[in-house]
Structure formats: C-alpha cells, structure tokens
C-alpha cells in the first residue's frame, strides 16, 4: 500500500549516481539550452517514476536515471523531519532546556511530521504533543517511560500499537484518525482517559477490548459508526467508567429511551454525553425502570417537593433571624434587656419539627445569633438618654481644673480657694445642659464653706483682733470691685492708707487682697483666667517687698516724679541701703518727701512697675494725678 517504505536501500545505492549526475551538470556549464532541460524533464515526468529501477542502461548514460532518483528523494523528503538539530532549535525557541533529558514537555504539534523519531535522549518527557501532523505509525517511544499524556489527534494513524513502554500513561488522545479497532491498550495499567472520537469504529467487536481496561474512567466514542445496542454490555462491564460520550453514533437512535436506559444500566455513570447525570435524574430513571412513566412522575414530584422545602426552610430561617434582630432593636429602644431565651418562643413550622436534623441546625443558628447579639451589646453598650455622659463631663471638668490650680496652691502659703473659681467658668460654659443647676449649687455651697479660711490664717499669722481683720478684708473687697472699673477714689484712698501704715499688717492686707477676689460676685470676672493670674503677680510683689523691706511701697515710686533730675544725679546709689537703713522704711507723714528720698529704691522700680502693671493694668492713668492729690493732702 505504501511502496515508499520498502525503497530506502535503492535510495542508498543510487546516491553515487546522484553525485555523478550533479557532476555532469556541473561540467555542462551555463551554456545548456532550455530546450534540452525541458526534454529531460519530459522524459522523467511520465513512466520514469515507476520504471526507473528496471531501465538501468550499461551504456553510461546516467543523466535520466539521476534525475529520476533525485525527484523520488525530493518526494520522500518533501516534509520536515524530526531531527536532533530541529528539536534543539525548537527547545530554544520555546525557552525549554537545551539538555534533552531535563525537558518534561515537548510541543511538536502543527509541524507536519510524518514519523516519530530521534526522541531517545528525551527520557524525562511527561507530556508529548504530536497533534495535527502526518504521523502514520506510533513508534520510537521506547525511551519515554515516564510519559503521562500522549496527544496524537488529527493524524494518519490506522492502528494502535507500540505502547508497551508507556507503563505510566494516563491520558491517550487518538481522535480524528483512521482507527477501526481498539486494541493493545490492556498493557497500560493506569490508563484513565481514552479519546477515540471521529474514528472508524462500527461493531461491538471493535470495542470488545475495552473489557480489559479496568482502570478506564473517561471514554469518548463520539462520532463513530457504532450502531449495535449490545455495546452497552461492553460498557456495563467496565467497573470504573464515570464519563461516557456516545454522541454522533447511530446507536443513540437504536436504543429506546436512550438516556434513561444508559443511566440505569451504567450504575456509576456521572456524566453522559453533554450533561451530568444528577442524583435526581438517576432516581427518576430507576423509577421509570420499575414502574414506567407514572412512577417516574411521582418520583420527580417528590424530589421537587423536597427541594422546595429546603428553599422554604432557608427563607424561614433568614426571616426568623431578621425578626429577632428587629425585636432586640425595639427592646433596646424601650430600654429593656431582651432575655436570651425569648427567641425560643417563636413558633416554627410543623414540617421543620418533623425533621430532627433540620431542627438541630436551626438551634445552632439560634445560638449563634444570640451569642452574636450578646457580644455586640457587651462591646458597644448604648445609653438611652445620654444624661450619664453629660454628668461625667461636668464632673471631669470640676476635677481637672483643681489639678490645674493645684500648682498655684503649691506656691502659696495660705489655703487657696481658686478650685471653685476655676470650676465656675466650666459651669458657665455648660449652662445649657441639664445638670448645670446642680453643679452650680454644689459650687456655691463650697464657696460659703471655705469663705472664712483666709481670715483664720491671718489670725494665726498676726495677733490682731477680729474687727481689724474684718476691716482689712473689707477694704480689698472695695478695691477688687473698683479695679475692674475706671479710675476710682476708693483705690486712691487705699493707696494713701497703705503709705501711712508701714507695718506687717500691710503684708497681711495684701494677702487678704488675694483671697478677697473670690468673695466678689461671679459676674465681675469677665475673663476666665484673670483670677488665676492675679494671685501669682501679687505673690511676686510680696516677695520683692519682703526682700527690700516695707519701704518699697507705692508712695516712694510716686515721689520720684517730684524729685528734680539734678538731685537724683548728685545723690549716690548704694544698693546696700535697701536692707540696712531702717529710716527709709518709714516715710514721714508731713509730706516732706524730698529730704527723705531713698536712692536705693531706684533699683527695684523696674520690677515693681512690671508687677503693678500686671496686677493693675489701669494704674498708669491714676499716677498722672497723684502729684496733685499729694499736694492737696498736704
């Protein structure tokens, strides 16, 4: 049928004559006429192709014989060959290993090969693609002992052979060939998939060999010429068959109720032709085999009712979860705590009570929902009105401010009443809230309770009667009220009284001036932090007054404006007289301040001016008229 296969010895013998003919043409030179070339072609075109071996002439005229042999070699070598150089070049092209044994996949499809050869070095192949070629035989695969997948579809194969070395072959594709009989496959112990679509299979005998393929699971026999319904007996004897494709065969029309029959007879089949075999389809097919179409209809109705019940139960479970969530939300809005067992009172459908596994699943779902809501309530507690949070804010404001003013109390020797003063702005800013009235009432009680503490300390520091203390504390009250207004006479009167009394009681008067600010009305302190700054400035002034003596008072600073610049320049300025000269601490009351002017007090003018400017911001306006007031008093 194929005479070319038996002619390679003749080709090897004719190679010298081919070289001679080439030499003859080489000697002929370029002067050969086109007519001669056409004549030689005509002589080799017809019967020369078939009768050239028998027409050997001993006369030495080898021209026509050489051309006939060359044309035959061209015809045989017309297609590409699977050479080692070609395979190595192909591996480089596909970025595979240059070392043949390291490659596990070789892509040789769509190359036009007519035979399998030169694969001895590729011992590590696991997948070999040879589809869409002109291969006529399965051969030269002895070195591929590790091969798992062999793809030989769309070739010119007529027989299944030479597969014994492939002991690990798992998938074999022989579709679109000219195979008429399935054979020589029992030597493949682990063959799982066999594709024989578009071949020449016709009878039961053609597929009888499949009984010996015990591990075959996927079988594709589509688009063959199988017409005998007895093929089901062969397929039924295959224990591991799961997927079967018989589409395109006449047998599908010859078997009555084809799909039901095949499903019933092949017990383990899960996929038939173009769609799966579902458990419902198998149950209906078995019911049809028992009682016909009526039994099949009843079985189908039962399956549909069970499926509908599953869907209904799922929807009811979702609705129950939603309903419980709404009930919990309503209970939280009402301020109630929902009981964890309250959900159990929700009635369930009688169908759900009949089936115990479904009831257990519902119980698990209910328990999960309850635990989820309890965890949410613990992590994110909700207050119904928010009054507790408001109360905490007010209390925190009252607690933090005493810590702020505690630094001021640490620097001062007397007991400080400023915590109540520092809390009063907080209460004023939070007046729009509901708990402000109670907070203000508590602060007022605290003020009334601590009101007498500065007087008691003054009484311990100086042996003065209670009436004198009342007088001393009353005068700074007038001063605190008038200092916030414009230039007022009570302030000037207090200044004159302080100049006339250079005794330690003046210091106590200054201390009482500190605490007298808190006894005034809360409306007088327009700026929130002025009452904190005043005691600090007054304390600095007192420390300077104690170091420099009682003589460093306001009238001395006022008399500096009356002294001429010449006398101030002539007098020396010893810094030691501030603490040594006792006469300077008691200025005369007759107004003769020029003769008793202390020069040492000039050193403390800057510090005292800064302290007075911080305590009394409007005092410079009063100093303008102090000179006239002094002369008026004289």
Curated annotation (Swiss-Prot):
Gene3D superfamilies: Ribonuclease Inhibitor (3.80.10.10). The modification Phosphothreonine is found at residue 462. One of its GO terms (cellular component) is axoneme. GO terms for biological process: cilium assembly; cilium movement; determination of digestive tract left/right asymmetry; determination of liver left/right asymmetry; determination of pancreatic left/right asymmetry; heart looping; inner dynein arm assembly; lung development. SUPFAM superfamilies: Outer arm dynein light chain 1. Residues 249-288 form the LRRCT domain. Residues 22-42, 70-80, 326-336 have a biased composition (Basic and acidic residues). Residues 1-80, 326-358, 481-505, 559-634 are annotated as: Disordered. LRR repeats lie at residues 101-123, 124-145, 146-167, 168-189, 190-211, 215-236. The modification Phosphoserine is found at residues 349, 465, 488. PROSITE patterns: LRR. GO terms for molecular function: dynein complex binding. The keyword Phosphoprotein applies. Pfam families: LRR_9 (PF14580). Keywords: Cell projection, Cilium, Leucine-rich repeat, Phosphoprotein, Repeat. Its main location: other. Residues 48-62 have a biased composition (Polar residues). It is found in: Cell projection, Cilium. It comes from the Eukaryota. InterPro entries: Cilia_flagella_integrity, Leu-rich_rpt, LRR_dom_sf. The keyword Lipid metabolism does not apply. Cilium-specific protein required for the stability of the ciliary architecture. Plays a role in cytoplasmic preassembly of dynein arms. Involved in regulation of microtubule-based cilia and actin-based brush border microvilli. Belongs to the DNAAF1 family. This is Dynein axonemal assembly factor 1. It comes from Mus musculus. The lineage of its organism: Eukaryota, Metazoa, Chordata, Craniata, Vertebrata.
């Amino acid at each position: 049928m194929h005479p070319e296969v038996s002619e390679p010895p003749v080709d090897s013998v004719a190679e010298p004559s081919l070289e001679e003919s080439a030499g003859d043409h080489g000697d002929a030179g370029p002067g050969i006429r086109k007519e001669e070339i056409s004549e030689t072609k005509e002589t080799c075109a017809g019967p020369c192709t078939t009768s050239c071996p028998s027409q050997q002439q001993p006369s030495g005229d080898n021209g026509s014989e050489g051309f006939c042999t060359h044309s035959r070699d061209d015809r045989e070598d017309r297609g590409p060959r699977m050479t080692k150089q070609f395979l190595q070049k192909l591996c480089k092209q596909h970025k595979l290993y240059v070392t043949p044994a390291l490659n596990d996949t070789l892509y040789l499809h769509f190359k036009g090969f007519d035979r399998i050869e030169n694969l001895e070095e590729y011992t590590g192949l696991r997948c070999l693609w040879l589809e869409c070629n002109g291969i006529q035989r399965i051969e030269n695969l002895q070195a591929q002992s590790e091969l798992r997948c062999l793809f030989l579809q769309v070739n010119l194969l007529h027989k299944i052979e030479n597969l014994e070395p492939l002991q690990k072959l798992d998938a074999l594709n022989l579709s679109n060939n000219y195979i008429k009989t399935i054979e020589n496959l029992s030597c493949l112990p682990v063959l799982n998939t066999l594709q024989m679509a578009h071949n020449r299979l016709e009878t039961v005998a053609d597929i009888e060999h499949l009984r010996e393929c015990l591990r075959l699971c996927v079988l594709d026999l589509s688009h063959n010429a199988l017409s005998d319904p007895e093929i089901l007996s062969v397929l039924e004897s295959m224990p591991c068959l799961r997927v079967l494709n018989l589409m395109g065969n006449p047998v599908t029309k010859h078997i009555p109720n084809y799909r039901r029959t095949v499903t019933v007879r092949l017990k383990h089949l899960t996929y038939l032709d173009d769609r799966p075999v579902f458990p419902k389809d198998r149950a209906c097919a078995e019911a049809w085999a028992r009682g016909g179409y009526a039994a099949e209809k009843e079985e189908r109705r039962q399956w549909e009712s069970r499926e509908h019940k599953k869907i209904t139960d799922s929807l009811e479970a979702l609705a129950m979860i939603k309903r419980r969530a709404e009930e919990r939300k309503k209970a939280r809005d009402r301020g109630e705590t929902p009981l964890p067992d309250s959900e159990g009172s929700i009635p369930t459908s009688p169908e759900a009570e009949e089936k115990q596994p479904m009831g257990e699943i519902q119980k698990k779902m209910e328990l999960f929902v309850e635990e989820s809501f309890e965890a949410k309530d613990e992590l994110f507690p909700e207050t119904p009105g928010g009054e507790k949070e408001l109360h905490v804010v007010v209390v925190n404001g009252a607690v933090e401010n005493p810590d702020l003013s505690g630094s001021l109390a640490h620097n001062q020797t007397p007991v400080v009443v400023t915590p109540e003063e520092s809390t009063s702005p907080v209460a004023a800013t939070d007046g729009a809230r509901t708990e402000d009235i109670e907070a203000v009432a508590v602060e007022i009680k605290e003020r009334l309770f601590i009101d007498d503490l500065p007087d008691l300390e003054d009484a311990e520091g100086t042996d003065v009667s209670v009436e004198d203390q009342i007088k001393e504390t009353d005068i700074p009250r007038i001063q605190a009220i008038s200092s916030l207004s414009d230039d007022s006479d009570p302030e000037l009167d207090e200044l004159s009284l302080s100049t006339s009394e250079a005794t330690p009681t003046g210091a106590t008067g200054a201390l009482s001036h500190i605490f007298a600010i808190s006894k005034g009305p809360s409306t007088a302190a327009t700026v929130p932090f002025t009452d904190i700054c005043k005691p600090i400035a007054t304390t600095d002034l007192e420390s300077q007054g104690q170091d420099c003596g009682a003589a460093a008072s306001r009238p001395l600073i006022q008399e500096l404006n009356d002294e001429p610049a010449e006398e101030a320049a002539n007098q020396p300025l010893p810094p030691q007289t501030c603490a040594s000269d006792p006469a300077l601490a008691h200025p005369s009351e007759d107004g003769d301040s020029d003769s008793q002017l202390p020069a040492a007090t000039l050193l403390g003018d800057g510090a005292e001016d800064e302290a007075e400017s911080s305590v009394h911001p409007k005092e410079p306006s009063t100093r303008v008229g102090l000179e006239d007031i002094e002369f008026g008093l004289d």
